[in-house]
Amino acid sequence: MEDSPQGLKRSRDPDQDQDDDSGEAGKADGSGGENQERSSDQIELDDDDFQETRPKPKRSRTHPPQQNLIEVVKGNGDLISKAVKIWVERYEDSPSLATTELLSMLFQACGAKYSIKDDLLDETDVDDVVVSLVNLARAGELEDYQSSRKKELKNFKENLVSFWNNLIIECQNGPLFDRVLFDKCMDYIIALSCTPPRVYRQTATLMGLQLVTSFISVANTLGSQRETTQRQLNAESKKRADGPRVDSLNKRLSVTHEQITTLEDMMRKIFTGLFVHRYRDIDNDIRMSCIQSLGIWILSYPSLFLQDLYLKYLGWTLNDKNAGVRKASLLALQKLYEMDENVPTLGLFTQRFSNRMIEMADDVDMSAAVCAIGLVKQLLRHQLIPDDDLGPLYDLLIDQPQEIRRAIGELVYDHLIAQKFNSSPSSLTGHDDSSSEIHIFRMLQILREFSTDPILCVYVIDDVWEYMKAMKDWKCIISMLLDQNPRTGSTTDEDSTNLIRLLFVSIRKAVGEKIIPSTDNRKQYHSKAQREIFENNRKDITVAMMKNYPQLLRKFMADKAKVSSLVEIIIFMKLELYSLKRQEQSFKAAVRLIKDAFFKHGEKEALRSCVKAITFCASESKGELQDFSRGKLKDLEDELLDKITSAIREVKDGNDEYSLLVNLKRLYELQLSKPVLVESMFDEIALTLHNFRNLDEEVICFLLLNMHMYLAWYLHSIINCEAISEASLSSLISKRDTLFEELSYFLNGIEESKKYGNQLSNRICAILAETWCLFRKSNYDSGKLERLGYCPDSVFLEKFWKLCAEMFNTSDETDEEDENKEYIEETNRDVSVIAACKLVASDVVPKDYLGPEIISHLGMHGPGVTGIIKNLITFLRKKEDDISNIYLESLKRAYHRYSSELSSGREESRVDKCLEEWRELAGGLSGMYIGAARNKYRLEILSVVKEGVEFAFRDAPKQLLFLEVAILPFATRLSVSDIIDIKKDVQGRIVHVNTDEDPSGWRPCFTFLETLEEKCLKNEDLQDDKEAANVRRRGRPRKRPETERKRLFDEQSGSDEDESISGGSDREDKLDEDAPLIETIRSAARRKALKGERSKGH
C-alpha cells in the first residue's frame, strides 16, 4: 500500500473528534495568512494564464469545451455522466489542467473557493493547501451546500456521490490506475476529513466513502473478468502449453490481478486514513454514514472486508450513544447474517458480540430495538445462540410499545411455534409440522406460562396473531375444544381455558376489534378494503361456529373461567346467516343456553357477558329469530323478578341472604343494559331496605344500586315521553325521596355507629352524587319538569362531605383478599373523590363550600387523589375567571384542621404532619403560578395575599402563622412593587403594637417581612448586575474565553502565538480590575440603607 506523503503531518490527534462548528483550526504559523492571500491571488492569475497561454482551438479540432464542474454537481444530475466524459477527454489532453479543475471542484464542494495553479500542482504541498482552507473556514468564507435549504441545492449530496461514481467508472480503463490522479484526490479528501470544520469533514467523508464503494464496483467487475480469463487460460493450456494465445491470456490475467490489487490498496488507504477516524466523529451523521458504508463494503466485497479486522467496527458501534448509528450497525449485520455463506466467517464476531445484540432488543430507541429483534432472528436461524439466552426477550411480549411486541411475536412464532430455525423433528412425530393442530398445540404450551393472568394471555395472543395462520383456523380450534381432533387428543382443563381465550381474542382481531388498549385513545379508522375483509371474516366465523356453538356452550357452561368468553362470541357473528343457512334451530338453542348460563352464574363477568349477548341477539337478529330472542329476554326478566321476590321472602323467613345477593347482582347487570321498569319491584326493594336494617353490607349496596338504576331509567323514560303526566312525575319524585331517605339513614348510621365498612360508604357517596346530578335544578328550569329539580340542603351536603373526607383517609392499597373481589374498581376511595369533584364541576351544589373543602386535601392522600383534585382545579380554572376565593378558603380549611389538632392536645407527630400538609398545600397552589402565569393572574395572586393578610390579623397574633405558611408562597410570586405595597401594609398594622409581649406569637409576622425584604433585595441585585454587565459591554468588547485549541499539524503550532494569547488574557484581566468600583459597591450600599430603615421602623 502506498503511504500518504503527508502521513506524519496528518496524524490524528484524539481531540480531533471534538467539533468546531465555527471552523477554527489549530493555530498555524505566519505563513497561513500569506497562503490565504496567495491562493486568492492565484485564482485571478489562473484565469489570466488560461486566457493568455491557451491557444484558441481551431474549428477543425474537437477539443472538449471547458466547464465548471461544481455547477454541474449543483445543477441537473442527469448531465453528470456527460460532464464526466468531457472531463476525462480533457484529462487525456491536459492532465495537470484537468486535475486542478477536479481539485477545485473538490474544494468548492466542501464550501471553499480555492484553486491550485496547474503548473504548480506537483510542487504544492497538501498540508499547506488544507491549512489555507481551514483558515478560510475560520474567516467565515465558507458555504455549506449539504445543509443548505436552497431549492437548487436539494440534490447536491446525491449529485456529488453520482459524480464520483461516474468518474471512477469512466476512468477504469485509464486514469484510475495511473497512480497519480486518484492518489492526489485521496490525499486531499483524507486530509480534509481530519480538519475541525464540520462541513469539511462531512463532505470529505461523503466523497471518501463513495470512492471505496465505487472502487468495489470496479473491483467486482475486474474480478469477474479475472475468473473468465482464468477459465479461458485453463482451457487453452490443456490444448497447448504455450503460444501467443496463452501468452495473451497470461498477460491479461496479470494486468487484471494488478489492477485489483491497486484498487484494494486504495480502499485500505481510505479506510485507514479516513474511516478509522470518522467512525467515531462527534457528528452523528458522519458516524452513521461510515457504518452504513462499511456494511455495504463487507456485503459487496467480502474477500477483503469480511474479516474481524473490519467487522469489529460494527460490533463497537452497537454501543454508540446515537440511536441512528446503532440502528445502522444492526441493519448492516442483519444483511450480513442473511447470507448463509457469510456465517462461518462470522463465528468469532458472533461469540464476541451476540450478548450485546440480544440486549439491544430492549434498546431505548424503539426502531433500534425492532432491528435488534430482527437480528436475533437471524442468529437463531443459524443456531448461533442458545435458547437459554432468550429469556429476557420473551418478557418483551408484554411490553408497552406495539412495535416491540409485534417484533417479539414474530420471533416467538418463527422460533417456538413454526420452529423454522429448528432442525430437530417435531415433538409430535408422524405429523405434518406445519399443520394448524401442531401450531396451536405449541401456542398452548406458551400460554401455560401465563395461565394465571388472562390479560397477559391476551397480550401474547395479540403479539403472535398476525403471523400465525392457525389462529384463524376456526374449525381446527373448535374440533380441539370438542375433543374431536384425533391428532391432538383431549385437552386438559388449563389448555381448554387458554384455547377458548385464544378463540375469543382471535375472533375479535379477525373482525377488527382492538383488544389491547392504546395509550393515545385515538379512534380506529379502517379502509374500505379492511372493512370488507372483516365482513368476510365475520361470515367465515359464523359458518364455522353455527352448528358447533350450542355444543361448546353445553360443554363449558358450568365453567366460570370459560363461559364469559364463550358466550360473547355470538356478538361477532353474522346472525342473518342462520336464516340463510337454515340453521334457525341452532340459533334458538344458543339463545336458550345463554339464558340458562345467566341463571347458572352469579359472577360479574359471566353475567355481563350473558346480558350483552342476549340483548345483541334481541336487537341485531331479524324476523322470527328476533322475535324469539326478545321473547327469551322477556322471559329472563320475568324469571329474575320472580327469583328476587322469592329470595326476599326467604330473607323475611330468616333464611340465608345469598340467593337475594346473587339475584340483585343479576338485576343490576341487566339494568346496566336495559330498563326494568316494574314498579312493584322498586317498592319491594325499598320495603326490604326499610324493614331489615341488619342485612349484609354487600346486599345493602346492591339494593341501593338497583333503586338508583330504576330511578335513572324512569327519569329517562319521562324525559323522552311526548305526553308527561302529573302522576308519573309524582311517582318519580316519591321514589326519589324514598331513595334519599334510605341513603340518609345509612349515612347517619355510618357516622354514628361505624358498623359498616368502606364498600357501603363509597357506594353511598357515588349514588348520592349521581342522583343529585340527575336531578340538579339547572336541568329542569321551566315547564312541567321543573318539579324534578333538586338541591341538597346544607346539613345533607355536610354529612356527604364528612363521609367523603373519611374515605379520603382510607388506604389506597388493596388487600390481597380484596384483589379478586368483584366491583373492586367501583368501591375504592377514588370513587368518593370523583363523586365530590363531579358535584362541584357540574354546579350541582354551591362550589364555595365543597370546592375549597376538596382542594384543601391536595397532596394529602397520595398521587391518585392528588391527580383527581388537580383535574378539578384545571377544570375550574378554565370555567372561572377568578378562583382566588376558592384558593383562600381551601387554605383556611387547612389552617382550621391544624388549629383543631393543636388545641385538642393530640400527639406532636400528628400536629407536625398536619402543619406540613398545610404547607405543601400552599406550595402546590402557589406553584401553579409560574412563568407568564404570574403576570396573567397577578390580580388573583394579589387578592389571595391581601385577603389572607386580613384574615391573619383578624385575631393577631393567634392567626399570624397563616401569614408565614399560607400567604408567603403566594406573596413571593408577585412583582417587587407589589411586594413593597404588601410589606408596607403589614408594617402599618404593627406600628402601634407592642410585639415584645408575645415574641413567639409575632415571629411569623417578622419572618414574613424578612422574607419579602430578601426577595426585593435579590431582585434589585440581579437588576444591578444586568446593568453593570451592560455598561461593561458597551465600554469594551467581551472577554474571549480561553479554550484548548485543536491543532491540525503539530509543527505549525508556534509558541509565539500561544504567548500572545496568554498576554491577551492578562490584559483582559487587568481591564476587569480597572472597572469602576461604583458598580461593585452599589448593591452593598443599598443593602445597608435598607437595613437602617428597618431598624428605625422597629
Swiss-Prot record:
Keyword presence, Cell cycle: yes
Residue pairs linked by disulfide bridges in the UniProt entry: none
Gene Ontology BP terms: cell division; meiotic sister chromatid cohesion, centromeric; mitotic cell cycle; spindle attachment to meiosis I kinetochore
Region (Disordered): 1-68, 1027-1077
UniProt KW Kinase keyword: no
Chief location bin: nucleus
Pfam families: HEAT_SCC3-SA (PF24571), SCD (PF21581), STAG (PF08514)
Biased composition (Basic and acidic residues): 1040-1050
Tissues of expression: Expressed in roots, mature leaves, buds and seedlings.
Function of the molecule: Essential component of cohesin complex, a complex required for the cohesion of sister chromatids after DNA replication. The cohesin complex apparently forms a large proteinaceous ring within which sister chromatids can be trapped. At anaphase, the complex is cleaved and dissociates from chromatin, allowing sister chromatids to segregate. The cohesin complex may also play a role in spindle pole assembly during mitosis. Required for centromere cohesion maintenance at anaphase I and for the monopolar orientation of the kinetochores during both male and female meiosis. Also involved in mitosis.
Protein name: Sister-chromatid cohesion protein 3
Originating organism: Arabidopsis thaliana (Mouse-ear cress)
Higher taxonomy: Eukaryota, Viridiplantae, Streptophyta, Embryophyta, Tracheophyta
Gene: SCC3
